[in-house]
């Protein structure tokens, strides 16, 4: 009976030690930002998904815009061709969850989307030279949809930028950077806006040209 009691007591002590160790580990991880990493990682992924949804919405508008503009026989073909090519490039890129952890792939994707946005902006500016196109209700409706989508893209991108900023601050700050290093939480890439204005800026158009 004495040996059985000793064995039972030993098991209780072992359980208590294991439980205390688990609590201690949970406390350490929590104190070093593990839970916050989990929350911000999911938040940034959700924000990125919304960016992709809005980019896809814009890409889906392009075929109808192109088809409508083609009805204007005199429309500048170079401008139209650039829109078609930019859409093809942007939609051909494979975007996976790993894109968020690959700065090079992220940069290429951003550039392709910036080129599509720029090509569409140029098309809208050039369209001002064509009264028949401006009077086309179908084109007017598509233009409104496109402008609304561009606004939603801006909102989605800003939310993503903020979520990644919060995540990256945590990943680079002490002591949470130790947790990041131990568990493989790498800083995430974000939108570089330094040259985006140049990519998306519409050209100056001389409306006096025939």
What function would you assign to each model-found segment?
Residues 2-210:
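A helix-centric hydrophobic-segment signal that preferentially recognizes long
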């Amino acid at each position: 009976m004495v040996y059985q009691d000793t064995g039972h007591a030993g098991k209780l002590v072992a359980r208590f030690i294991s439980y205390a160790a688990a609590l201690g580990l949970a406390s350490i991880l929590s104190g070093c930002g593990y839970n916050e990493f989990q929350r911000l990682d999911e938040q940034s992924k959700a924000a990125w998904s919304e960016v992709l949804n809005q980019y896809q919405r814009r890409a889906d508008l392009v075929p109808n815009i192109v088809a409508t503009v083609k009805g204007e026989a005199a429309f500048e073909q170079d401008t139209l061709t650039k829109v078609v090519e930019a859409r093809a490039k942007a939609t051909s890129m494979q975007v996976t969850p790993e894109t968020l952890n690959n700065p090079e792939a992220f940069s290429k994707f951003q550039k392709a989307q910036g080129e599509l946005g720029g090509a569409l902006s140029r098309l809208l500016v050039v369209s001002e030279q064509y009264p028949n196109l401006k009077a086309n209700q179908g084109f007017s409706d598509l233009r409104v949809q496109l402008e609304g989508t561009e606004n939603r893209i801006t909102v989605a991108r800003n939310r993503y930028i903020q979520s990644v900023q919060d995540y990256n601050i945590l990943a680079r700050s002490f002591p949470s950077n130790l947790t990041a290093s131990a568990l493989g939480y790498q800083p995430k890439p974000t939108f570089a806006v330094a040259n985006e204005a140049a990519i998306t800026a519409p050209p100056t158009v001389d409306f006096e040209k025939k």
